[in-house]
């Protein structure tokens, strides 16, 4: 696993909507974003790691689907999350 338990707990604590929340779209997107950022840095030094690149593409697609779901359910939460994570410019 890429993230340590402490780093994962920190991300969950920052983005949870209520105590003990680990499955809300905000938390899921934040965890995927942290893993995507790590892998992006990883590819700067390991340019030929194509196996991990396929995993990265799956994570990006999964994050896109969760964001699309959140946008269809609650646009304001979607916009807040995008702003907090700095995804769209």
UniProtKB/Swiss-Prot annotation:
Record GO biological process: translation
Pfam families per record: Ribosomal_S15
GO terms for cellular component: cytosolic small ribosomal subunit
Subunit annotation: Part of the 30S ribosomal subunit. Forms a bridge to the 50S subunit in the 70S ribosome, contacting the 23S rRNA.
Role this protein plays: One of the primary rRNA binding proteins, it binds directly to 16S rRNA where it helps nucleate assembly of the platform of the 30S subunit by binding and bridging several RNA helices of the 16S rRNA. Forms an intersubunit bridge (bridge B4) with the 23S rRNA of the 50S subunit in the ribosome.
Similarity-based family: Belongs to the universal ribosomal protein uS15 family.
PANTHER family hit by this protein: RIBOSOMAL PROTEIN S15, BACTERIAL AND ORGANELLAR, SMALL RIBOSOMAL SUBUNIT PROTEIN US15M
Listed name of the protein: Small ribosomal subunit protein uS15
Gene label: rpsO
């Amino acid at each position: 696993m890429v993230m340590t338990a402490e780093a994962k707990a920190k991300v969950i604590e920052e983005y949870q909507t209520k105590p003990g929340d680990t499955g809300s779209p905000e938390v899921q997107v934040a965890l995927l974003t942290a893993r995507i950022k790590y892998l992006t840095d990883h590819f700067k030094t390991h340019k030929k790691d194509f196996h991990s690149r396929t995993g990265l593409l799956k994570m990006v697609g999964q994050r896109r689907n969760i964001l699309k779901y959140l946008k269809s359910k609650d646009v304001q939460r979607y916009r807040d999350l995008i702003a907090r994570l700095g995804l769209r410019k």
